[in-house]
Amino acid sequence: MQIDYLARHDHFLTESARRHFAEWSHSWPGDTVEARAKRLRLRGGNGAIPSVFVAFEGPALCGSAGLIQNYLPNRPNLEPWLAGVYVTPSMRRQGIGTALVSAVQNEARRRDITRLYRCSATAERYHACRGWVVLERLHRRGELQAVIILDLVLA
């Protein structure tokens, strides 16, 4: 398996957008696959914020994860964010998500970022086992979500 910037593997853009849409469209009323693809293209990155990483094996897309500047507009002091962590269902529990999250953390460290934030309704326990701490819980897009933080100096 390889992990690299989506910007270097544009052929995964449409499939990534389809998968993100299928996973999260319930939280984004009015969203479309095309709009997702446009956002992913803008976030494709290549050593910058925002950046999207893809995990792949040959022609098979395994997953993706991103580093974005801000996820919660009403909390501009919380930045940057690990976002859009997605692993193909048939490939879960094989370390792909962990590898993608590590790629984002390493990108942040290269940019001298000392902490990362994440908002999730489903992955709080997963991240807690890896050093992330709950900062707050909030209702967002119809779900109770945890805003979590990772100190990259200690991690």
Mark where each language-model region is.
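C-terminal "cap" of GNAT-fold acetyltransferases
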Residues: 118-123, 136-155
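Conserved GNAT acetyl-CoA-binding A-motif
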Residues: 101, 108-121
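Conserved acetyl-CoA-binding loop-helix of GNAT-fold acetyltransferases
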Residues: 84-87, 93-106, 129
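Conserved acetyl-CoA-binding loop of GNAT-fold acetyltransferases
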Residues: 128-138
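Conserved beta-strand in the GNAT
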Residues: 52-54, 60-70, 81, 86
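A short beta-loop-alpha structural element at the N-terminal edge
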Residues: 1-16
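Short coil/loop residues immediately preceding or within conserved phosphate-binding loops
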Residues: 50, 77, 82, 143
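Active-site rim helix/loop that mediates acceptor-substrate recognition in acyltransferases
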Residues: 25-54, 62
